[in-house]
């Protein structure tokens, strides 16, 4: 019983009050950091016109349109890599994480859905960063019909300065 009492007191002392330090497992290459990137993630659906693959001219292949969108996103990701490149968190990033489209090899697909991951350095606004991506795709793929879902994640980057990140997270 005495051993249980000692353990109980130890646990209570560790869990009471605010911690002196918190460890968050981020991919930092074992470097100590005091901030981390935020993220905004959403799905975009590129629309086409379905038809039988023996008459592809009667449809609009959403996979071809989505391929152009993916290449535009790759181009923007390269531009983002140059922005804030000396930031302790590294540069902002943009990635297509998943792509789904088509229902059969003999059908021209009418839709393709891409899941977008835009990582933010502290100080970047999640929704403004999302808007930048949407606008870039619209400018570079003007003929594509694209529907953007609301973000399923929008989290500002965190910094040891805290105030800017907290304001961005509330908006």
Question: Model features per residue range: what roles?
Answer:
Residues 1-75:
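Fold-level recognition of mixed alpha/beta catalytic cores in primary-metabolism enzymes, strongest
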Residues 43-171:
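Metal-dependent amide/peptide-bond hydrolase catalytic core
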